[in-house]
C-alpha cells in the first residue's frame, strides 16, 4: 500500500513508544436486496465521511496502555457509531492487516467484522445520535459493490472519491479476499487491484 509497509501484528506491537496505533474496522453484512429489482447488492459494507471530507472506516487512535488494540477500537466504534455498536465486539479474530508509515510514525491496523443485516442497519440508524456525529464523522455510506452497465457507475465511480490513508486499498483487498464481489468483478474494474 503506497507509502506504507505491511508488517505482522507482533512486529507492529513491538515498534516502541515513538509509534502511534490507529485501528479501523470494515463492518459488512450479507444483503439479499436488489437495486432497481435486478442488480444484486450481495453485501452491505459501511464506510464513513470524515471531518476532513475523505472517506474512511470507523475507528481511530488507540492507546495500548488502556488494554488491547481491540479494546481501543471498540471504544472508538462506540463513540463514532453510537449505542448499536454495543451489540457486537470486534475481536482479534477479525484482524486483517497492519501497515506502518514513517511520517508520521503511525501503524494502521485493519479489521473486518461480519454482522447481520439487522445489526448493520441498526448501526446506520443510530449513528446520527453518536457522540462524534457531526464532528469527527459526517455520516455513514454504503459502498456500492456492483458495476452498472456503463462500467462507470457503482463501485468504479465510488473509488474515484478521496480516501484517507490506505482506506481505499484496505477496502479493495478486503472485498476481494472475503469474496464480497461477483466472481470476475475485479477484471472489469479499471483500477489497480491489491496485491
UniProtKB/Swiss-Prot annotation:
User: Which EC numbers does the record give?
Assistant: 3.6.1.62, 3.6.1.64
**Cofactor note text:** Binds 3 or 4 divalent metal cations. Acts specifically on U8 snoRNA with magnesium as cofactor. Has broad substrate specificity with bound manganese or cobalt (in vitro).
| Any Pfam family the entry gives | Nudt16-like
Q: Which cellular compartments is it found in?
A: Nucleus; Nucleus, Nucleolus; Nucleus, Nucleoplasm; Cytoplasm
Residues that coordinate or bind Mn(2+) 1: 59, 80
Query: What's the chief localization of this chain?
Result: nucleus
Essential cofactor(s): Mg(2+); Mn(2+); Co(2+)
Instruction: Detail which positions bind Mn(2+) 3.
Output: 76, 80
Q: Into which EC class is this enzyme placed?
A: hydrolase
Annotated substrate binding sites: 24, 50, 57, 166, 170
Which conditions up-regulate this protein?
By steroid hormones.
Instruction: Name the residues that bind Mn(2+) 2.
Output: 76
GO cellular component labels: cytoplasm; nucleolus; nucleoplasm; nucleus
Alphabetically, which GO biological process terms does the record hold? dITP catabolic process; mRNA catabolic process; NAD-cap decapping; negative regulation of rRNA processing; positive regulation of cell cycle process; sno(s)RNA catabolic process
Please describe the quaternary structure of this protein.
Homodimer.
What family is this? Answer: Belongs to the Nudix hydrolase family. NUDT16 subfamily.
Q: What is this protein called?
A: U8 snoRNA-decapping enzyme
What species is this protein from? Ovis aries
| Lineage of the organism | Eukaryota, Metazoa, Chordata, Craniata, Vertebrata
Amino acid at each position: 500500500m503506497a507509502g506504507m509497509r505491511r508488517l505482522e501484528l507482533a512486529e507492529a506491537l513491538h515498534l516502541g513508544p515513538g509509534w502511534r496505533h490507529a485501528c479501523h474496522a470494515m463492518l459488512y453484512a450479507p444483503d439479499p436486496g436488489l437495486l432497481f429489482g435486478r442488480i444484486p447488492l450481495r453485501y452491505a459494507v459501511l464506510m464513513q465521511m470524515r471531518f476532513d471530507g475523505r472517506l474512511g472506516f470507523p475507528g481511530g487512535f488507540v492507546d495500548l496502555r488502556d488494554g488491547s488494540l481491540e479494546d481501543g477500537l471498540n471504544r472508538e466504534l462506540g463513540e463514532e457509531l453510537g449505542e448499536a455498536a454495543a451489540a457486537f465486539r470486534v475481536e482479534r479474530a477479525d484482524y486483517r492487516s497492519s501497515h506502518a508509515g514513517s511520517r508520521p510514525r503511525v501503524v494502521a491496523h485493519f479489521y473486518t467484522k461480519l454482522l447481520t443485516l439487522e445489526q448493520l442497519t441498526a448501526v446506520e440508524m443510530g449513528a446520527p445520535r453518536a457522540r462524534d456525529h457531526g464532528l469527527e464523522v459526517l455520516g455513514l455510506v454504503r459502498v456500492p459493490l456492483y458495476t452498472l452497465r456503463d462500467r462507470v457507475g457503482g463501485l468504479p465511480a465510488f473509488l474515484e472519491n478521496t480516501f484517507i490513508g490506505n482506506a481505499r486499498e484496505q477496502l479493495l483487498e478486503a472485498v476481494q479476499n472475503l469474496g464480497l464481489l461477483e466472481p470476475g468483478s475485479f477484471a472489469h474494474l479499471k483500477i489497480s487491484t491489491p496485491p
